[in-house]
């Protein structure tokens, strides 16, 4: 039996705009109210997906969500027909309309936490949609996320789906952006590493400037839901000082693949102790941790955040070597680019760099790792997936044509009140569900 890691990238939605909604994410805040280009954003994402598929990787597509989200506006007291709801919202609360038009679901690293069957007691792949309760504009995503994941991973013999945790700070959950898995082959047991920002019950250590979006209590709940073995599970606190420097998720300061953990010197609280626990638990599986620690004197936390060096993808190529996928911003920074080129000569499995232009996503605060949800499967599970969502030449061509017909090449905040945008977005998503064979996953389809 062989194993695969499938990267499911979020397709950027038609209402992609710069609203500066994510306090603690400095790129998001800095670019507030700039003009966006939804068509370019979607095409940049598709190019990355296709390039990885062409490398021999298993690559999937996750559909965007319905925006503007009229049902949420109705819950907040706006009435009339759908166009009236949007017009009222723009007139009296444009910030709310912006939040409920956000295309932030493109960052599918926050969609869910996924545990492979090799790690779960019942031998199934487990999914828990993230509640994302720390940010209002993202807290509405989990219901549709669950429906889309269930439309892709339908067979209950292989896949188990859990509802999001209770939407309170005690169980604040940001999904796979705070979750790593370290081990050998993708279909073999591994050590799952949950990274949290704060322990809410009895914890003393917490950031001061920016919020800790992930709680220890949420990590523990997900581990229980996924039926994980405590001997192969590690809970690690992120360094609160780096959260206060803009490291809002762990995938902004660390990334893992198989036995490799690529991380900054300041990534974790009590870092040496955390790495020792990971190393000891991997040893029980006869696996050695390869920790690539970037010294602060080579790359500062500020440079790591601005270039998204660690918000990269580490992928294993069919030839067994590893490639690090970084945004163009990493190449433009002298210190970061120098370190990357030194790293691929260090004799670790990481021996190749791939650079992608993801500027539309980066300006809103999301790099390569933000855009993808990793799902490790065996042969039987792979065959049970809805294959209409897997990237190939035909799907790439079809989705590019779809984007060309359906997306605008410029969007401002004022455009969100345009009645035509709502019609355009719904028509686009309705067609997309047919292309990807998802069924009726959106509220407007039901």
From Swiss-Prot:
Q: Which Pfam families match?
A: AstB
- Gene3D superfamilies noted in UniProt: Succinylarginine dihydrolase
EC primary class: hydrolase
List the GO biological process terms. arginine catabolic process to glutamate; arginine catabolic process to succinate
Q: Which UniProt keywords apply?
A: Arginine metabolism, Hydrolase
| EC number, as in UniProt | 3.5.3.23
State the active site.
174, 249, 370
Any one GO MF term held by the record is:
N-succinylarginine dihydrolase activity
Q: Which reaction does it catalyse?
A: N(2)-succinyl-L-arginine + 2 H2O + 2 H(+) = N(2)-succinyl-L-ornithine + 2 NH4(+) + CO2
Entry-linked InterPro entries: AstB_sf, SuccinylArg_d-Hdrlase_AstB
Q: In which pathway is this protein known to take part? A: Amino-acid degradation; L-arginine degradation via AST pathway; L-glutamate and succinate from L-arginine: step 2/5
Which residues are substrate-binding? 19-28, 110, 137-138, 213, 251, 364
Q: HAMAP family, from UniProt?
A: AstB
Function field: Catalyzes the hydrolysis of N(2)-succinylarginine into N(2)-succinylornithine, ammonia and CO(2).
Recorded family membership: Belongs to the succinylarginine dihydrolase family.
- Quaternary structure, from the entry: Homodimer.
**Protein name according to UniProt:** N-succinylarginine dihydrolase
The record lists the organism as: Acinetobacter baylyi (strain ATCC 33305 / BD413 / ADP1)
Lineage, top ranks: Bacteria, Pseudomonadati, Pseudomonadota, Gammaproteobacteria, Moraxellales
The gene name on file is astB
């Amino acid at each position: 039996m062989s194993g695969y890691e499938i990267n499911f990238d979020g397709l950027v939605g038609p209402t992609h705009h710069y609203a500066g909604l994510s306090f603690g994410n400095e790129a998001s805040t800095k670019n507030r109210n700039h003009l966006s280009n939804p068509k370019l954003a979607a095409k940049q994402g598709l190019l990355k997906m296709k390039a990885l598929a062409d490398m021999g990787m298993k690559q999937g597509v996750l559909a965007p969500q319905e925006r503007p989200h009229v049902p949420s506006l109705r819950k907040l007291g706006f009435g009339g027909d759908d166009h009236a709801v949007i017009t009222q919202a723009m007139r009296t609360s444009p910030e709310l309309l912006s939040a409920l038009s956000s295309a932030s679901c493109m960052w599918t690293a926050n969609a869910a936490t996924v545990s492979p069957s090799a790690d779960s007691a019942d031998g199934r792949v487990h999914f828990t949609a993230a509640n994302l309760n720390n940010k209002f504009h993202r807290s509405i995503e989990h219901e549709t996320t669950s429906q889309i994941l269930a439309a892709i991973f339908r067979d209950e013999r292989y896949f188990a789906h859990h509802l999001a945790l209770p939407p309170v700070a005690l169980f604040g959950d940001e999904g796979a952006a705070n979750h790593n898995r370290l081990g050998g082959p993708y279909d073999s047991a591994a050590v799952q590493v949950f990274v949290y920002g704060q322990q809410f019950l009895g914890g003393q250590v917490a950031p001061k400037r920016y919020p800790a979006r992930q709680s220890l209590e949420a990590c523990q709940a997900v581990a229980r839901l996924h039926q994980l073995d405590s001997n192969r599970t590690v809970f690690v606190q992120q360094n609160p000082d780096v959260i206060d420097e803009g490291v809002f998720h762990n995938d902004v300061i660390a990334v893992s693949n198989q036995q490799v953990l690529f991380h900054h010197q300041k990534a974790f609280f009590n870092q040496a102790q955390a790495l020792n626990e990971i190393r000891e638990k991997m040893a029980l599986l006869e696996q050695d941790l390869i920790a690539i620690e970037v010294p602060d004197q080579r790359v500062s936390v500020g440079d790591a955040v601005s270039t998204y060096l660690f918000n990269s993808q580490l992928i294993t190529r069919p030839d067994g070597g590893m490639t690090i996928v970084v945004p163009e911003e990493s190449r433009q920074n002298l210190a970061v680019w120098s370190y990357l080129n030194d790293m691929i000569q260090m004799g670790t499995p990481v021996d190749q760099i791939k650079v992608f232009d993801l500027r539309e996503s980066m300006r809103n605060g999301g790099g390569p790792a933000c855009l993808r949800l990793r799902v490790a499967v065996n042969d039987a599970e792979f065959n049970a997936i809805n294959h209409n969502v897997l990237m190939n030449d035909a799907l790439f061509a079809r989705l590019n044509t779809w984007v060309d017909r359906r997306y605008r090449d410029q969007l401002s905040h004022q455009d969100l009140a345009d009645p035509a945008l709502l019609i355009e977005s719904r028509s686009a998503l309705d067609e997309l569900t047919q292309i990807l064979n998802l069924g009726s996953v959106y509220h407007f389809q039901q």
